Design a protein with these regions (language model features):
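CN hydrolase (nitrilase-like) catalytic-core segments centered on the catalytic cysteine
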Residues: 64-84, 162, 168-273
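Active-site catalytic loop in hydrolytic enzyme cores
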Residues: 92-183, 196-205, 209, 288-291, ...
Length: 298
């Protein structure tokens, strides 16, 4: 793909991964995906939820600072903005340790110089009964919810972009997307690890709905495939990484849960879904249907 670096055009990549429990293996995949995306002209790379490890939240949290520094270095080395999916963190944004032995689910944005631009702590925690191997999910048993919405500033090609940050289950809450738009967001990041069942039912619909609610591009990075745990159990995620335009149309997507050619020695344990935000086209679309000028209940 040719580089797209015109003024007020931002090229983004939603990454689909199949993260397992081995953190070092996952980091190798993340690094390769970032280098690949950068070579294709991407300016913002969005990794999925639990990108560094699936199923080892507390062990991963012990390495939060180290892993964050690694992500910062990946961003700096490739000269891109990196939305580092999510990492479990043992402390709140003010440095206070999370009480009750819980963690925060943290999404971070790193700039091309490696500096951290923003930290968002996932507000809505997944609680559901699902007809899969696990059966029920209660994220609040492990995580404390965040309390603050976050809109971060990106600068590329002499243009400024505002990124509203979300994580996975946040997609089910239109008020968050609307509040981010009201705070100036032009695009929304949604690193996710939807279960196969809930993803099959709602993933695409939720991405399109939140795009319509906010009139923002929505970048849905995703975990996809089977994730094996040390106790012999496993979890299946939906994948289908997708980027949706402000008007709810799907710009680009990966139409599978599984990554292809897993028997090939050259197989990459990730795929990239690239898309371009045309800032002026989005502004014009919002002007043609100014829903936030008409909003009365928010």
């Amino acid at each position: 793909m040719n580089e797209i670096r015109n003024n007020e055009h931002l090229t983004v990549a939603a990454v689909q991964m199949n993260s397992q429990q081995n953190i070092e293996d996952n980091l190798a995949d993340i690094k390769a995906a970032i280098i690949d995306a950068s070579k294709q002209g991407t300016q913002l790379v969005v990794l999925p939820e639990n990108c560094c490890s699936m199923g080892r939240q507390f062990a991963t949290a012990e390495r939060f600072d180290e892993l964050s520094n690694t992500m910062a270095e990946y961003a700096r080395a490739s000269g891109i903005y990196l939305l580092a999916g999510s990492l479990p963190c043992p402390y709140r944004p003010d440095g206070v340790i999370v009480p009750d032995g819980r963690l925060r689910q943290v999404s971070q944005l790193f700039a091309p110089d490696g500096m951290r631009v923003a930290r968002y702590d996932k507000i809505h925690l997944f609680t559901a009964t699902v007809a899969d191997k696990q059966g029920s999910y209660n994220e609040a048993a492990t995580f404390e919810p965040g309390t603050q919405t976050v809109v971060a500033t990106l600068e590329a090609n002499d243009a400024v972009y505002q990124l509203g940050m979300m994580v996975c289950f946040d997609l089910r809450f239109p008020a968050l997307a609307q509040r981010l738009r009201q705070a100036g967001a032009e695009l929304l990041s949604a690193p996710s690890a939807f279960t196969y069942m809930t993803g099959q039912a709602h993933w695409s619909l939720l991405l399109r709905a939140r795009a319509l609610d906010s009139q923002c591009m929505v970048i849905g990075a995703a975990q996809g495939g089977e994730h094996a745990y040390k106790d012999g159990s496993s979890r299946q995620t939906w994948g289908h990484a997708t980027v949706t335009a402000y008007d709810g149309t799907i710009i680009n997507s990966y139409e599978d849960s599984e990554l292809k050619d897993t028997t090939n020695k050259e197989h990459k344990n990730y795929t990239l879904v690239l898309a371009t935000l045309d800032k002026q086209a989005q502004i014009q679309g919002r002007q043609k249907m100014p829903i936030f000028d008409c909003h009365r209940l928010g």
